[in-house]
């Protein structure tokens, strides 16, 4: 076990579930530390008042439960979507992007309450331990961090349940055995991993999907919506302006009802292993398609292509936990500069798991009818100019061909 004997007061990222309740009691009994709890409402869809009651029952005096949904979407999700960030070609980073926000609040509460440490419930095998801790150290280089899953002596679920029983921590009857899979959720997405999902050759059971109906069960009639953008951020649906969190929640409803946003993938974790996950990102999938569509008529080709080159690196930084790094902030500044004229409206058709762009318009559009028309362009484009353009671009190819023949 790492030495935490000098820790007096700890801020714990607390869900109210069995695992973090055991961690709470472990911090009290094994370290003798005073515990402050922080529970974030990230739009996970759970009632959070039970977390307060359970913390009170376990003797906690300082309890923080905060609604961070608007901050989450405005300051973390939307900046990420300006970049069109996708990890390994498919993953929209729903879990990754929530961790720096949680760490930020843990550090803020530690400063406010005079705590000298923070604690989290991430295991020693996953990415989240890295994300939580890199973010925390970036915000407070002197903070102590306790990760009980790396420190304690419990070897099995039975050990945890025995500890819970010994310390009178309530255990729901359906928690006596291990859950069939692990779940993480927020307003952007839900992820399911482990247990029944560990064999990547087997299809995930339908009951794993909690955010969307199956595409096969989706309506036979398509849903058509319009998403409005300003400076790269979605601001309206069908002409109705909404706050960031409200807008994403509405897109989630459209995605859910049309079976959109399911993903079954094997990803490369930062710690080195491969992991199979089943993710649902209904609103985010719609948002990404809409954002790329509005960029297609408002971004210059050079800027658009450079963004696409930078995106995998930007996505990696978020996945690995470097949200608060200078390189991510540098990339963000460039991305945000590119979004100054990304405004307008995109029309999308949602149908049985598919998001189809069927229209896009903008007062800042670079699309020119005169240039692309198949009819008389009235001198807007002289096709004779193409001959010289091609000849100059072919110069090196012709030189190579002449040498090699």
From Swiss-Prot:
ATP binds at residues 13-21, 40, 121. L-aspartate binds at residues 123, 127-128. GO terms for molecular function: argininosuccinate synthase activity; ATP binding. Pfam families: Arginosuc_syn_C, Arginosuc_synth. One of its GO terms (cellular component) is cytoplasm. One of its GO terms (biological process) is urea cycle. Its EC number is 6.3.4.5. It comes from the Bacteria. L-citrulline binds at residues 91, 96, 127, 131, 182, 191, 267, 279. Homotetramer. Belongs to the argininosuccinate synthase family. Type 1 subfamily. This is Argininosuccinate synthase. The lineage of its organism: Bacteria, Pseudomonadati, Pseudomonadota, Alphaproteobacteria, Hyphomicrobiales.
């Amino acid at each position: 076990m790492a030495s935490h004997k000098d820790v007096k007061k700890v801020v714990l990222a607390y869900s109210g579930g069995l695992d973090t309740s055991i961690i709470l009691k472990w911090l009290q009994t094994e370290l003798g530390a005073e515990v402050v709890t922080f529970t974030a409402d990230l739009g996970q869809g759970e009632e959070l008042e039970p977390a307060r009651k359970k913390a009170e029952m376990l003797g906690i005096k300082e309890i923080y439960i905060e609604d961070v949904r608007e901050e989450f979407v405005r300051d973390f999700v939307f900046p990420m979507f300006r970049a069109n960030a996708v990890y390994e070609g498919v993953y929209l980073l729903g879990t990754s992007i929530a961790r720096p926000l949680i760490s930020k609040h843990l550090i803020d509460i530690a400063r406010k309450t005079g705590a000298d440490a923070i604690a989290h419930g991430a295991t020693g095998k996953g990415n989240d331990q890295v994300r939580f801790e890199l973010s925390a150290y970036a915000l407070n280089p002197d903070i102590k961090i306790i990760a009980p899953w790396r420190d304690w002596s419990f070897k099995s679920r039975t050990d945890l349940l025995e500890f819970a029983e010994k310390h009178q921590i309530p255990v729901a009857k359906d928690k006596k055995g291990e859950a069939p899979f692990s779940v993480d959720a927020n307003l952007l997405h839900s992820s399911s991993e482990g247990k029944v999902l560990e064999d990547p050759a087997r299809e995930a059971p339908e009951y794993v999907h909690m955010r969307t109906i199956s595409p096969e069960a989706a309506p036979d009639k398509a849903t058509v919506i319009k998403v409005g953008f300003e400076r790269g951020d979605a601001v309206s649906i069908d002409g109705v302006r909404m706050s960031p969190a409200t807008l994403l929640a509405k897109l989630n409803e459209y995605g859910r009802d049309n079976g959109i946003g399911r993903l079954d993938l094997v990803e490369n974790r930062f710690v080195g292993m491969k992991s199979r996950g089943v993710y649902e990102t209904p609103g985010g999938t719609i948002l990404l398609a809409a954002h790329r569509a509005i960029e297609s008529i408002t971004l210059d080709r050079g800027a658009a292509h450079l963004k696409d080159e930078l995106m995998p690196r930007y996505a990696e930084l978020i996945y690995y936990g470097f949200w608060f790094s200078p390189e991510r902030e540098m990339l963000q500044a460039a991305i945000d500069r590119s979004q100054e004229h990304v405004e307008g409206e995109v029309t999308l058709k949602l149908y049985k798991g598919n998001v189809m762009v069927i229209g896009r318009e903008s007062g800042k559009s670079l699309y020119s009818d005169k240039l692309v028309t198949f009819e008389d362009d009235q001198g807007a484009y002289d096709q004779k100019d193409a001959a010289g353009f091609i000849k100059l671009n072919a110069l090196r190819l012709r030189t190579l061909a002449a040498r090699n023949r």
